[in-house]
Design a protein with these regions (language model features):
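Periplasmic plug
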Residues: 12-15, 28, 32-38, 43, ...
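Outer-membrane beta-barrel domain signature, strongest for Gram-negative TonB-dependent receptors
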Residues: 191-403, 410-411, 580
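Face-selective signature of the C-terminal outer-membrane beta-barrel domain
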Residues: 295-301, 305-307, 339-366, 379-499, ...
């Protein structure tokens, strides 16, 4: 029954089958695994992938425009599995629904052979809400919060008898309507989930379920025109850019009206005519210009009044205004809508006490549409179907268990996008009015006359076929020493075509590429029991990381990259099993697909991680984790937004300013060791809980993050922070009331951006104190 296996606060309170297939205590699994039970998720307020950083060592997730579609582990994308089956990859098409899950296991580092090729940082295995066989039960939960947050969930389930067979069901309905701290950004969704378990015969059981999820929101572009002065002092570069509106665009701006500047070697210093005449320079408002000296006013552009290189060479400073963290690059008319259908089925044949045959089946369908009026559009559809068969066997002797099987998987994905460089900085977000000059036609939109084709570009429709064989087992050399091994061989073939919707491509409707990739994965994972409650382990893995492009497309061999891991650790369960602690050190390498260069970005990483849960007394408990890591670029990053220095942004804000490799020389100058920036090297979390008696409990603690550079060029840095959170809970009979607060001290801190793409032009200031009141009635 779901109630029996959900677990409590300690990671050892339930077993995990999210690494080597068979259920084991986390104490005996030779990998870094964080077990999240329903109790722990509620205590820590885990509602999306944005919250995972609070519960894993060294956790940090950049802002992918406000839509947490994919987890981020050890500084890289991570895979998402549902009941052991890999879900569709979607970077930020929708927040992955948590409405269907009971708990989750977070595995740091590449997946072993049983799970297959996924993203390089690690993976999260969702444990679905399971039906109740023992008795009928349910809960009704309502949550209200700051910024008109309203969320409600009805969850019911119980046993039933159908066709003479014992069965059990579970239904969960979740609805949310919420504004946010950020102006013009909402987060509304509905989730409908149902699951059924049935004993079909004495030795055959079925577990099946489905979820429909609909999301309505828009992207959060954060602050644009990023400078160190903006980060440190909230001083924002004020002013519009040259008017490029046109009748053909209906009074707005055509994409061709946005200047393009490619950084060259000379761009590390203030340039000349290419910047002064690009139309990308900011035009400061007249009221601000009046504060300048006559000498500096004379150096502004004589026709447009825009900044010039001469202005800055003479010592001029860009004019700024104070801006709040809630003023972001978002338009009330923007949207980022998505629908998702997920279906799963497990058919299990218990052939004997030592042999089980399992067939797992998954369908995952996603459709999303986005438009942001500053000049970005994206649309995608993705369909995944996979069937996996596993024979699990247990033996006596050296080989104690062996699970072998095969998998066949088909993926279809279509993405349509406007262009790879977005004019993030063109709009003056300090202006309370969104001007026509800051609205750029994009994606499905069309000019009113002339060339009336839509603006989709860099689009693709791909098909991917994967066929795999895998095996995982345990060799038990003694009562103290065991070794887990896993192996996988897989073949993949793909095709890539230009979608018919891409009207400006002469090859639309045609196949433009096809190919294939054969690869293998293996790992050895010895674990030594120093005592029944102390385990030391080593894990060595070589495999393949599969990183699709943003919409899930796999159309190149570059989507497949090698990955490797060496990890060693110690796990203990002490003090009558009231204290669990785990320490791990690791070194790894991974290649991540860059969908702007269609090539791999290589990263080498090493780090140390610690986590502990201690039930000190019946009233007092502690949860703590700590992580430090250091990552280095294997090669210079590819095509992306270029880094600017303080005086440089005002000259190019209205343009598309891009870099490739290190054209400015700033990485070699400021970051000679080639460190992969964009996240703190060190972070820690601590939560203490105390039961006051009479139904009351208080919890709280800090999240500590070290200072770090936002970009590889090290022109932007973020300060260290201490972020406090806490909750007060009251339980009486079937009712639970919890008041939770985050960032209690309203600490100024920021959510960075992926340094591969947009960290030079986008940053998001985190919200000040937020509160939620949660009332749950159980029946």
């Amino acid at each position: 029954s779901a109630a029996a296996v959900s677990g409590g606060l300690l990671p050892t309170s339930r077993s995990s089958d999210s690494v080597f297939g068979s259920a084991k205590s986390v104490l005996d699994i030779p990998r870094s695994v964080t077990v999240l039970t329903p109790e722990l998720m509620q205590k820590l307020g885990v509602r999306s992938f944005d919250d995972i950083a609070r519960v894993i060592p060294g956790g940090e997730r950049p802002n992918f425009y406000g839509v947490p579609g994919t987890p981020f582990i050890r500084g890289d994308f991570a895979g998402t599995f549902f009941n052991g089956m890999q879900r569709a990859f979607q970077r930020n098409e929708m927040p992955t629904s948590f409405g269907s899950l009971e708990g989750m296991d977070v595995v740091r580092g590449p997946a072993p052979g049983t799970f297959g090729a996924t993203q390089g940082g690690g993976y999260i295995n969702f444990l679905p809400k399971s039906p109740y066989y023992d008795k009928f039960r349910g809960s009704l939960r309502t949550t209200i919060g700051t910024y008109d947050y309203f969320n409600t969930q009805l969850d019911v389930g119980g046993p039933l008898l159908a066709f003479g067979r014992p069965m059990a069901y579970r239904i969960s309905l979740t609805s949310q309507n919420a504004d946010s701290y950020y102006k013009n950004v909402q987060n509304n969704y509905i989730s409908i989930y149902g699951a059924l378990k049935a004993r079909l015969t004495r030795d055959v059981s079925l577990y099946t379920g489905a979820e429909f999820y609909s999301y309505r929101s828009n992207e959060n572009g954060g602050w644009n025109r990023v400078t160190q002065d903006l980060i440190s002092n909230g001083n924002y570069l004020v002013g519009e850019v040259a008017d490029r509106t046109s009748a053909a665009a209906g009074g707005y701006v055509l994409p061709s009206g946005v200047p393009f500047i490619g950084f060259g070697a000379s761009s590390a210093t203030i340039g000349g005519a290419q910047f002064d005449n690009s139309g990308g320079a900011i035009i400061p408002p007249a009221s601000y210009v009046a504060t300048l000296s006559p000498q500096l006013r004379a150096l502004l552009h004589p026709t447009t009044g825009a900044y010039t290189s001469a202005f800055f060479n003479a010592g001029g400073k860009a004019l700024t205004t104070k801006i709040g963290g809630n003023q972001v690059n978002a338009d009330p008319g923007d949207f980022a809508n998505a629908q998702n259908f997920l279906y799963f089925a497990d058919l299990v044949n218990t052939r004997s006490a030592s042999s089980t045959l399992k067939n797992q089946f998954l369908i995952d369908y996603i459709k999303s549409d986005k438009i942001s009026s500053y000049g970005y559009a994206f649309a995608m559809e993705q369909f995944i179907i996979e069937d996996k068969v596993t024979l699990e066997q247990r033996f006596k002797g050296l080989l104690t268990s062996l699970s072998s099987g095969g998998s066949v998987r088909y993926s279809w994905a279509k993405q349509l996008q406007d262009f790879s460089s977005e004019p993030f900085s063109r709009r003056d977000i300090s202006n309370p009015r969104i001007t026509a000059n800051s609205i750029i036609l994009t994606g499905p939109q069309r000019p009113a006359f002339g060339d009336t084709r839509n603006f989709w570009a860099q689009s693709s429709a791909t098909e991917l076929y994967q066929l795999a064989l895998f095996s995982v087992g345990e060799l038990k050399f003694s009562e103290s020493l065991s070794t887990y091994f896993s192996a996988r061989v897989e073949g993949a073939s793909f095709t890539n075509a230009i979608p018919m919707e891409h009207e400006r491509n002469a090859r639309r409707g045609q196949r433009v590429a096809k190919g294939g990739k054969n690869y293998y994965m293996f790992s050895l994972n010895p674990v030594y029991k120093l005592s029944p409650n102390v385990s030391a382990y080593v894990s060595a893995l070589h495999g393949t990381a599969l990183t699709p492009s943003q919409g899930g497309n796999v159309g190149s061999e570059a989507n497949f990259g090698e990955t490797g891991l060496i990890e060693g650790g110690l796990k203990v369960s002490l003090l009558d099993n009231s204290l669990f602690a785990a320490l791990a050190v690791y070194e790894g390498r991974r290649q991540r697909f860059n969908n702007f260069t269609n090539a791999q970005d290589g990263v080498r990483s090493k780090g140390l991680e610690f986590e502990a849960t201690w039930l000190a007394t019946k009233q007092l408990s502690f949860l703590a984790n700590f992580g430090v890591k250091e990552s280095h670029l294997v090669r210079m990053p590819g095509f992306r937004f270029g880094a600017t220095q303080e005086y440089y942004m005002p000259l190019v804000a209205g343009a598309l300013f891009t870099d490739g490799g290190d054209a400015t020389g700033l990485i070699r100058k400021n970051n000679p060791e080639g460190r992969f920036e964009g996240a703190p090297q060190g972070s820690a979390n601590l939560i203490a809980s105390y039961n006051l008696g009479n139904g009351f409990e208080i919890s709280g603690g800090p999240r500590i993050r070290g200072s770090y550079y936002l970009n590889h060029e090290r022109t932007l840095s973020l300060p260290s922070t201490v972020i406090w959170g806490g909750s007060v809970t009251y339980r009486r009979g079937p009712i639970q009331v919890m008041l939770e607060a985050t960032n209690i001290s309203s600490e100024d801190y920021f959510i960075g951006s992926d340094p591969i793409f947009a960290s030079n032009t986008v940053i998001t200031k985190a919200p000040p104190i937020e509160a939620k009141l949660n009332v749950t009635y159980k029946f």
